[in-house]
Structures are given as C-alpha cells and as structure tokens.
C-alpha cells in the first residue's frame, strides 16, 4: 500500500501503476491486482469499493516503519501529498473531508504548489 500510495500522490496514470505491479510480482493475477490497484490503492474506480482514497502524509510512513525523518524524503512526500489534495479538492468534497481540512490549514500552500511540479519532473 505504501508504494501504491506514493504512486498515487505522484499522480501516475492508474494503468501504468497496474502494469508496474503486474510486471513486478511473479504471482500477480488480474483478479487480485485490479481491485488492489484501481480500487484500494488509487481510488481510480471513483469510490465504488472504498469511501475515500488511501493517501497519507510522511507521518504515517514514520509511524509504520523504521525510516527516520531526515528533512528531505519527508518534505518530498508531504509536498506531493498536499499537492495531490489540492488537485483533487473538489473530488474530496463529501468523501475525504479530513484531506480538505488538512489543505485548508496548510500554511505553505504557495511553496507546495511551486515545488511539487519540480519534484514530479525529477521522478
């Protein structure tokens, strides 16, 4: 889910994500990957099977792993996270209200919107 989460906040095309997962794993099957990638991982089915997208800030990664905060990867991750919320703001109305409030409270909006395209172009 973390890899799919990162691909989602990078706004990688869902079909490319699906293809990557199918080629990455020896035991990947359509009946598993279609739901895992398009529904749970990317919310690309428009909410048919999930109520909101599974996206997280770097805080979740820090809590669920032994990765340390270093001021680089977590800034990149959080920039992409908030950029994703900004670009999908209207889609979150009625579904992902927590994401809306996080964006609304964000103090570095202009900095994020300026930095995100630079990060995405380097990926």
From Swiss-Prot:
Gene3D superfamilies: Deoxyribodipyrimidine photolyase-related, DNA Cyclobutane Dipyrimidine Photolyase, subunit A, domain 3. InterPro entries: Crypto/Photolyase_FAD-like_sf, UV-DNA_repair_photolyase. It comes from the Viruses. PANTHER family: SLR1343 PROTEIN. This is Uncharacterized protein R855. It comes from Acanthamoeba polyphaga mimivirus.
């Amino acid at each position: 889910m973390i890899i799919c989460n990162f691909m989602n906040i990078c706004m990688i095309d869902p079909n490319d994500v699906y293809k990557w997962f199918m080629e990455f794993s020896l035991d990947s099957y359509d009946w598993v990957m279609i739901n895992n990638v398009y529904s749970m991982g990317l919310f690309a089915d428009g909410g048919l099977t999930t109520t909101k997208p599974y996206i997280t800030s770097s805080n979740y990664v820090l809590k669920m792993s032994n990765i340390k905060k270093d001021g680089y990867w977590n800034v990149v991750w959080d920039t992409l996270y908030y950029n994703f919320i900004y670009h999908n703001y209207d889609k979150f109305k009625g579904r992902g209200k927590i994401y809306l409030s996080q964006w609304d409270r964000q103090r570095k909006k202009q900095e994020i919107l300026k930095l995100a395209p630079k990060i995405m172009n380097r990926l």
